[in-house]
């Protein structure tokens, strides 16, 4: 696709807490003229469509309805949130086998419908499931994007904003690597109002140990939320809306997403979180951050962790 049509259509596959939060965020922002909700639980998709329809007098007109995989045929964007949720005490990587099975039953009927748009994947473990979507679909890597570390980077910016009493939108900082336990804060490139975060921290008496604790807090925040209320969904729903907006409005926005590595950071044949330019044709360019030697090692170690789980998961799926 060279550009988006005037009438934009999005299909959401998976109407759980994340999916419905994403649908609500899209409705609030008035993004896309047609929004289809697909899930095996039809009563929920019908109910959500009716509920979201009621918001249109306050937002923007939109055709919202419960649909089928066949509705993907003329969609611009298919967003996959379907999958088993992460339970208390469970890592994202623990979900791999059951969610690979679920994903394999989704991608084929989407592609068989004649869909020729962009896949955006958010189901966990998202880096692995994004890779699997790319493999199962046969689509170009630029048209299969993961939510990656978009939510984690938002958490980092919020935490740094609190620490230094600035608007999180004025913080330019990224979490990179796996969306999960091996992720890391790329502090070497992080800035607040063009000034390096470490310089600002030093001036305010915030030590490297303090920054490391802040990073740990970001890494573990999902577990904190899951333990308190069972799941995370508002943050990731909003992150998905932001990525969708960049695609549908051809923004060429730099966002932290799950992108296919083809030599960047010394990595190949893996999807992993990195800043990238996102627009109407999908992922237009990876922004290869100038990481420190320590950060580059963390990136490569994170990729190695993902690749092992990915290979084991795909092998088990093939043996079934």
Curated annotation (Swiss-Prot):
The lineage of its organism: Bacteria, Bacillati, Bacillota, Bacilli, Lactobacillales. The gene is ldh. The active site is at residue 179. Changing residue 172 to H: Shows a significant FBP-induced thermostabilization as in the cases of many allosteric LDHs, indicating the binding of fructose 1,6-bisphosphate (FBP). The keyword NAD applies. Gene3D superfamilies: Lactate dehydrogenase/glycoside hydrolase, family 4, C-terminal (3.90.110.10), NAD(P)-binding Rossmann-like Domain (3.40.50.720). Belongs to the LDH/MDH superfamily. LDH family. Its EC number is 1.1.1.27. The modification Phosphotyrosine is found at residue 223. It is found in: Cytoplasm. GO terms for molecular function: L-lactate dehydrogenase activity. GO terms for biological process: glycolytic process; lactate metabolic process. Substrate binds at residues 86, 92, 124-127, 152-155, 232. Pathway: Fermentation; pyruvate fermentation to lactate; (S)-lactate from pyruvate: step 1/1. Its main location: cytoplasm. It catalyses: (S)-lactate + NAD(+) = pyruvate + NADH + H(+). This is L-lactate dehydrogenase. NAD(+) binds at residues 18, 39, 44, 69, 83-84, 105, 122-124, 147. It is an enzyme of class 1 (oxidoreductase). Homotetramer.
């Amino acid at each position: 696709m060279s550009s988006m049509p005037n009438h934009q259509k999005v299909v959401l596959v998976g109407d759980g807490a994340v999916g419905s939060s994403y649908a609500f965020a899209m409705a609030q922002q008035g993004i896309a003229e047609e929004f289809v909700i697909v899930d095996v639980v039809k009563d929920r998709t019908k109910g959500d469509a009716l509920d979201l329809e009621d918001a249109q007098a306050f937002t923007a007109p939109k055709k919202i309805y419960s649909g089928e995989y066949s509705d993907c045929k003329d969609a611009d964007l298919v967003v996959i949130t379907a999958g088993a949720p992460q339970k208390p005490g469970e890592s994202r990587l623990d979900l791999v086998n059951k969610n690979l099975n679920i994903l394999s039953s989704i991608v084929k009927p989407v592609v068989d419908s004649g869909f020729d748009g962009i896949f955006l994947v958010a189901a966990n473990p998202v880096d692995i499931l994004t890779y699997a979507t790319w493999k199962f679909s046969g689509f170009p890597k630029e048209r299969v994007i993961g939510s990656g570390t978009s939510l984690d980077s938002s958490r980092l910016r919020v935490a740094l904003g609190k620490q230094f009493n600035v608007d999180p939108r004025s913080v330019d900082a990224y979490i990179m690597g796996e969306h999960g336990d091996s992720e890391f804060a790329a502090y070497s490139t992080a800035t607040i109002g063009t000034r390096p975060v470490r310089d600002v921290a030093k001036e305010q008496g915030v030590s490297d140990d303090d920054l490391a604790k802040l990073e740990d807090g970001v890494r573990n925040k999902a577990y904190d939320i899951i333990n308190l209320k069972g799941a995370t969904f508002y943050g990731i729903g909003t992150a998905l809306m932001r990525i969708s907006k960049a695609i549908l409005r051809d923004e060429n926005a730099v966002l932290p997403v799950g992108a296919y590595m083809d030599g960047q950071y010394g990595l190949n044949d893996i999807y992993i979180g990195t800043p990238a330019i996102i627009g109407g044709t999908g992922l237009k360019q990876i922004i290869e951050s100038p990481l420190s030697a320590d950060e580059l090692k963390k990136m490569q170690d994170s990729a190695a962790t993902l690749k092992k789980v990915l290979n084991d998961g795909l092998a088990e799926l093939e043996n079934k």
